[in-house]
Amino acid sequence: MNKKSKGTTIETLNYIDLFCGAGGFSLGFQKIGFENIFSIDIEKDFCKTYKYNFPNHKLIEKDISKLTEQEILNLTNNKGVDIIIGGPPCQGFSIAGNIGRKFIDDPRNRLFKEFVRIVDIVKPKYLMLR
């Protein structure tokens, strides 16, 4: 989608939201005029809230590690992506609630690699990792 401003066409920037949760990042990006390509999260309740907040967004409710390269390319329609945003789970790195558990054993700690994998496939102009 393009916008016009005083006779000048301004291209709408787009984004992908990984580990989207209820959509906090998407809300901010939507408010400044970005267009959502797709968002993904595995948590059912988060996805339910996201769908409520963004009924017109393409939401994938799936384990991000199961998202294939071909699925990603299909979701982006092989077009350029301006920015990938996301916040992989960090609870496994926190000392809070991890008494008696080694952070290295928490499978959530590997999810940042999925963010990197998707960035490598899509090659966006920018990324924002929280």
In which residue ranges do the predicted regions lie?
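Conserved active-site and SAM-binding loop architecture
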Residues: 1-130
